[in-house]
Each structure stands twice: as C-alpha cells, then as structure tokens.
Amino acid sequence: MEASLLKKNQSIELTIEDLTHDGSGVGKIDGYPFFIPNTLPGEKVTAKIIKLNKNYGFARMENIETVSANRVEPPCAVYSKCGGCSLQHLSYDGQLEFKRNQVEETMKRIGKLNVEVPETLGMENPWRYRNKSQVPVGFVNGKLTAGFYQKRSHAIIDMSTCLIHNEQGDFAVQKTREILAKYGTEPYDEQTGKGDIRHIMTRFAHTTGQLMIVLVTTKERMPFKEEIVRDLVEQLELTSIVQNINPHKTNVIFGDRTKTLWGKDIIEDTIHGIRFAISARSFYQVNPLQTEVLYQQAIDAAELTGEETVIDAYCGIGSISLCLAKKAKHVYGVEIVDQAIQDARANAELNELANTTFETGKAEEVIPSWYKAGIVADVLVVDPPRKGCDEKLLETILAMKPKKVVYVSCNPGTLARDMKILTDGGYVAKKVQPVDMFPMTTHIEAVTVLHLN
C-alpha cells in the first residue's frame, strides 16, 4: 500500500521492527513509520490509524497476528489504562535488553562514540521496588478514591494496589483512603479549585522499616483532622504523619508549608552504611536496592585511595557525596536547592563525616569559583537532571582537568552529548553501564567514567 493513500481510522497490517525510547513499537508502510503502543519487535499486527503527520503517524493496535516470544501477560489489572508503567507487556529480560540497546544506539547516534555497553544491571525481583508513592485523590463514580492518572489525562483510576510500590506504602495509601472517606473528606477539584485533600504520599525506609504518611491539603484547617490522625496511628505502624499545605490552583504537588501532625519530622534509611534523614520533601532515590547497585558502580569507577579531592556536582542531599567521603580526603558538593544542601550538611553530621563541604548554588557557577580559589578535583562526579550538564560546567571540567569524571545519568541522550564534548576535550571513555532503576518503565540510568588522556 502506498503511504499517500492512508487515511485516519483506516485499518492497516504491518510488522513491528523496533521500539522507540518511550516503548512504542515502530512499523512502516511504504517507508512511512507508524508508532503503535503495546507492540513488540517481530510482531505482525493489525492497527487502526489515529493520527497522520507529514513524516510519521500514530496507530492503535487492534490485533496481534504473530506474537513475540518476549510478550508476557501484564499482571496489573489497570495496566492498559494507567500511565505509571509502559513495559509490563515485555518480559523482564526483554526490558533489560531494550535498555541496553537504547544506550548503545544513543552513544553511536548522538555521541559518535564506540564504547562497550554491557548487559543492564537488573533486579532479581523487579516488582514492589518504589519506596515512595504520590497518589492524587479524587471522586470516581461519586466516591473518594486515590490512584494514578490515566494515560494522557488527569482522570484518576480507582485502583486497589500498585505492583511497583512497596507493600507497606501501598497498604498505607489504601488505609488512608478509607479513613478519609469515612470522615467525608472532600477531594480537591482541579477545575474549581475547591476541596480539602489533594494527594496522599508515603515514604518507606527499606533498611529501618520506618513509614511516613504525607497529606497534601489545600489549607491548614481540615475537617476531622485530629480524628483522621488518630485512626491512622491506630491502624498503621507509622513513624511520622506530615501535612503539606498547597493552596494554589496548580498541578504542582507540594506547597511551601509543611508541618508534622504526629511522630517524627523525618524517617531514616541507609545506603552503603551511610545514614540518611529523609523529610517529606527530601530528594531521595526511589529504588533502594538498585541505588546501592548504581552507587557501587560510581564508587568503583572513582577508585579512591583516601588521598583524593572529590567534587560532586548536583549533589542533592549528599547521597553519593557521603558514600565517597568514607574513602576520599575531602568531598565538595554543590546543589541548587538550598533545602537539599541543608539536608546534606545534616546527613554529614549524622554520619560524623567532617571531610565534606556543601554549598548552595548552580554547579556551573560555584565550581568555577572553587577552581579560582584553588580547589581542584582529582575526581569530579556529575549526576545531573535529564537536561544534562550545563555547557559552562563542561568548560570548567575541561579547564580543571580532573583525572576522572564519573558521570551518573538519567538520560542517555544528554549523556552521549556531554561525553562527546568531554572526549573531544581530551577524555577517554571505554564503557557505559546501564542500571535498571525503574523496572516496567522506559526510564534508563547509566554510569560511565571518563579518564583524562
């Protein structure tokens, strides 16, 4: 069939050749590509065209004529509707290979780099891994419910469990939902801006078993607040109940004010023997088992002897910094969020690690000022957001010339771009190691070390 004859709502037959970075299958008709969710390479499918652009189209899978050996039945009852997961229909071995291929292809296409990409480091059990849940509250069929948003919408799915949340947090969400419904709590309405409760959040500490519930409300006063807290304490094993007040008409989850309603202000967890105090709003990795794997890769790559000065750009609450401080002469950390820096200093004190300095600011501004003041890193660690490293920071790295740059990435595209700049500037990378921090989703973390040539 010629691509020029295609029309919306038409049924087409095609073979899926590849997966995109977001997990959709790609098949072509007369060289014209279609993106089709919930399909896998090698599958011959019938699909209905839902949108046609000049150079590509979108279709919805109607039937699979030839099924991939990697296809599995998704165990989640709401998988087809929910926006939380996107790869449950792909076997876990298939997911790990998909992520490895994504990294390898991105290194070649964007970075023009010929580096080794070993097998993705995955989980023995890729379920129930998330230590944090943030669940919107709303009305579904006239009753209060808490669940994830449907794909590409803000309609809430009424769900009894989430298979990637840890059991304790999952159970706590359901109990909290029941208690709120018991007292007739009114969910927040995004359209009108009315209602009392916006989100239920849970945080669970894997190593200590401590559990925090956060109620995100529209105002400080909330009907039956004391009774709700009493019931939560009676029915759940909790360390902390916190209220966050967000009065703004926005889809941002948190407001600026947080108060503890019961118990402690924080819960405590450990990574590689380092203790971390985690507040309601602290940034903390959501997969504790794989965080240990990811950080071990960074620790091994740094090859510290105790004599090195380390700079950790984008240090957050100091999670990588403090793991490295056990083996380094001194670690300097910088982070743009002031509360995270306060947390990092508190965590350094908690672990009696005096060989650390933390400063609030942009990495691309603070690190050049350190360099001018004579602070030169032997090892520089970057763990940037999805947009990658700022250009000015990369220029400073090339001027400072640390012996090693350890790069922890959550976006293979910007990792490849930044590696190209560093390798053009005299660094050499031999391999990029993918780590699966988020099974059942398309998110990819990777670690590499670049040596000064």
From Swiss-Prot:
This is Uncharacterized RNA methyltransferase lmo1751. [4Fe-4S] cluster binds at C76, C82, C85, C162. The active site is at C410. Belongs to the class I-like SAM-binding methyltransferase superfamily. RNA M5U methyltransferase family. Pfam families: TRAM, tRNA_U5-meth_tr. GO terms for molecular function: 4 iron, 4 sulfur cluster binding; metal ion binding; rRNA (uridine-C5-)-methyltransferase activity. GO terms for biological process: rRNA base methylation. Keywords: 4Fe-4S, Iron, Iron-sulfur, Metal-binding, Methyltransferase, S-adenosyl-L-methionine, Transferase. NCBIfam families: rumA. It is an enzyme of class 2 (transferase). S-adenosyl-L-methionine binds at Q285, Y314, E335, D383. It comes from the Bacteria. InterPro entries: MeTrfase_TrmA_AS, MeTrfase_TrmA_CS, NA-bd_OB-fold, SAM-dependent_MTases_sf, TRAM_dom, U5_MeTrfase_fam. PANTHER family: RNA M5U METHYLTRANSFERASE, TRNA (URACIL(54)-C(5))-METHYLTRANSFERASE. Residues 5-63 form the TRAM domain. Its EC number is 2.1.1.-.
